[in-house]
Every structure is written in C-alpha cells, then in structure tokens.
C-alpha cells in the first residue's frame, strides 16, 4: 500500500515536472521569436505614432521617403512616438530599425530619424552605407535643418 502511494506521488511529481518544463519551453520560444530580426521591412518608411501629421501629409512624406530610399538604395525612415518605453532615444531608434526589418542590401543600409514627443528627444541612427555617407558633420547639418521646424510644430517641413 505504501509502495503504491509512493509510486503515485512520484508519477504525479514527474507529470508536474513535465508540464512545467513544457510551459517554460513555450514561453522561451515565444520570447525568442519576439527578438528575431526580420529579413524584410515590416512597416512603412513613415511611422507616425505620435500623430503629428495629417493623412495627406503622411501620404506625401511616405511617397518622398520611398522615392529617396529607392534612389539611394538605403532605407530613409521617419518615426514619431509619444513614449520611448523606458529606453534612451538611441536604443529605441536602433531597436526600431533592427526589429522592423529596415535596411537595403546585405549591410542593411539606411537612416532612421526618431522623434519622441513625451521625452522631447530625438535621435538619428544609421546603418550600412548610411554610416559612411552621413558623417558627424552631416548629422549636425541635418539636425540644424530640422530642429527649428520641429520646435515650431511644423512637422512636415521638419521631416522633408
């Protein structure tokens, strides 16, 4: 009798252990899928989550970004957000670029301008050819061109 009871406990513990391990494996595989960098672009080149632009302005700017990107063979991306979700502007911009599959060619060439309204912060991230094409002086020039428009709330002019 004791032996049967002991065997049942062992069987129950083994069953619980198998269930626990299975649940953990499912959780970890789902988390791993979230951090996979996709091969192709997942979103448009304009992502206006802060809703700074009208629909017409979005269409106009997205067409312009597509034209420049195809001509230069480097993704040119503009992203606006309300919150950085606890990240620095640089980390958010880098992650957004990578985990949304931006970039053209084997070196994933491109540039992304991120504007965060809540943090009143911005960042420009470059990859591939974008790193070589846009120097620190170029980044300074770009920021000098768009920051006054951004400060005045002229968002379309800032992004063009």
Say what each PLM segment does:
Residues 2-15:
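Bacterial N-terminal signal peptides that target proteins for export
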Residues 14-25:
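Bacterial N-terminal signal peptides
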């Amino acid at each position: 009798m004791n032996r049967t009871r002991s065997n049942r406990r062992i069987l129950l513990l083994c069953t619980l252990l198998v269930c626990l391990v299975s649940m953990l494996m499912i959780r970890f595989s789902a988390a791993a899928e979230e951090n996979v960098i996709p091969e192709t672009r997942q979103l448009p080149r304009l992502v206006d989550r802060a809703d700074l632009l009208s629909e017409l302005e979005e269409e106009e700017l997205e067409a312009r970004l597509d034209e420049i990107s195809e001509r230069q063979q480097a993704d040119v991306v503009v992203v606006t957000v309300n919150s950085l979700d606890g990240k620095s502007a640089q980390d958010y911009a880098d992650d957004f670029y990578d985990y949304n599959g931006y970039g053209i060619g084997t070196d994933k060439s491109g540039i992304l301008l991120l504007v965060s309204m809540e943090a009143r912060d911005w960042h420009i991230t470059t990859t591939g050819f974008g790193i070589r094409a846009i120097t620190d002086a170029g980044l300074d020039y770009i920021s000098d061109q768009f920051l006054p428009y951004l400060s005045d709330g002229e968002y379309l002019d800032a992004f063009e």
